[in-house]
Curated annotation (Swiss-Prot):
Functions as a cation- and diacylglycerol (DAG)-regulated nucleotide exchange factor activating Ras through the exchange of bound GDP for GTP. In neutrophils, participates in a phospholipase C-activating N-formyl peptide-activated GPCR (G protein-coupled receptor) signaling pathway by promoting Ras-mediated activation of PIK3CG/PI3Kgamma to promote neutrophil functional responses. It comes from Homo sapiens (Human). CDD domains: C1_RASGRP4, RasGEF, REM. The gene is RASGRP4. Its main location: cytoplasm. Belongs to the RASGRP family. Residues 1-10, 20-30 have a biased composition (Basic residues). This is RAS guanyl-releasing protein 4.
Amino acid sequence: MNRKDSKRKSHQECTGKIGGRGRPRQVRRHKTCPSPREISKVMASMNLGLLSEGGCSEDELLEKCIQSFDSAGSLCHEDHMLNMVLAMHSWVLPSADLAARLLTSYQKATGDTQELRRLQICHLVRYWLMRHPEVMHQDPQLEEVIGRFWATVAREGNSAQRRLGDSSDLLSPGGPGPPLPMSSPGLGKKRKVSLLFDHLETGELAQHLTYLEFRSFQAITPQDLRSYVLQGSVRGCPALEGSVGLSNSVSRWVQVMVLSRPGPLQRAQVLDKFIHVAQRLHQLQNFNTLMAVTGGLCHSAISRLKDSHAHLSPDSTKALLELTELLASHNNYARYRRTWAGCAGFRLPVLGVHLKDLVSLHEAQPDRLPDGRLHLPKLNNLYLRLQELVALQGQHPPCSANEDLLHLLTLSLDLFYTEDEIYELSYAREPRCPKSLPPSPFNAPLVVEWAPGVTPKPDRVTLGRHVEQLVESVFKNYDPEGRGTISQEDFERLSGNFPFACHGLHPPPRQGRGSFSREELTGYLLRASAICSKLGLAFLHTFHEVTFRKPTFCDSCSGFLWGVTKQGYRCRECGLCCHKHCRDQVKVECKKRPGAKGDAGPPGAPVPSTPAPHASCGSEENHSYTLSLEPETGCQLRHAWTQTESPHPSWETDTVPCPVMDPPSTASSKLDS
């Protein structure tokens, strides 16, 4: 027998000892460190102690929490179980019921240990309110039960127990507040901060997007996460809905900013800029905004722009491919999870992926065992995942933010474009071509929008506040002398900075030649924002309810308004009348009458008319696109990002008028064939 046969025989003997060829050998690791997941699992089992073997009833769990305190209020043992119960009990038991059980236990305490047990219960309630002060403000029933508890303590308890309920810091909000915006260092009175998109550095833009993302992420509470897991929707959770809406708004903003440029080379420059922004977001470990920006760049309305992508450099195309693969949903976001596990320091997760994990954990196991006891291992696993997210909210961002640039981004993200509108503009920029085209530089989008459709419209009050904040920032940086006006050049640059209807709208009437006042800029941005955000032109009217004592007709539907039962609304500024149900459907812009209340113009100034915009065509650089606010009425308004000629004489360009081409039908397939 040679050495080779000897090795084969020895190998067969070894395999036979473990059950022959039919049974696979058990894979064992030798002299290797356990993975972080294994360490967390073991630590969780140790923290649960004997209860990890099964479950326990609500009374047993409550008793364990009470016995965690001594007479001085110190914890007798490790506080993991106590913190887990206080944070997770609402998943299986309402907080008001838990407080009622504590009140009952306090009232039933008798015997030699009565004072000690009551003192322990008071320490537990105080500890609960100090660690989770937000639950009192979000649950009126819990607030009522806690009030009865402290009233009982004040009536039946001793001085030591009453002192625990007298502290004024019981309901003080815990945790770090949102990061404070900081102005750029060295900002002098005469220095301007550029508020133009083309002038913003990619790193600066990424930092401000990270600030907005972190501020939105900090507002999410464990109660919001629980509500999402139990209901399967972000509706009813304003903070969580706002975070999802911010991500979707960033994605839409990226798409519209790319499509706002008339030529392929200009669109390629915007694409390249956002690719560098995405790379900077990756360096900042802001994966949630990175997902939004990359998703916008990989959207089919953008990926079909082959003429634009042809101008991208190979390095930019490669970088976009790498980011797309990093955030791809293949194998349950395996590449992102590996990257996230190796991150340290400041980082922001892809919220949708981690919420998906919470849902999976919740659905995988029941809340209670067959005998009715609570399933503690499940609650503990959920608690560990929630604590990871809560710990991330206590981070300190590595970058500061300029308040003026935040106002610019906030108003820019207050857009509300539908998928159909974005596709129509995409086809208007690069129509379908029957000739064969080179393949797209990257595949169909791999990055998915985890909560599609959650892009809430800004309400009138919020939008007005954002406009006022931006106007303040504009005049602070573009009018350092305090003259109260900005130049026409600055106005044109600012109006072209937004992806909503600015270029196609009639500019505000100027009181002085070549300058625009604060009121003119405010009214202009309000009018453009109202159209873009689908709030309607009624947003610009100041309606008040009136009773018409003489025959009047509605300016919206031409219906009759007369009598006590025919109350309607009249605009204080222009006198327009309409029904209550027609108020939000007004298609006439508010024209302030001379001498009317709130008129910003000089006395006797003529009211400027707004002629209907006429079409322009010619080269692809001047290709126009029209959006119908009311398709059935044919009311057409031009969008800002289309570079069309203006009806105002001073804004006319050298283009040849021709009929407007109808945009491609959106009923067909949205993917470029």
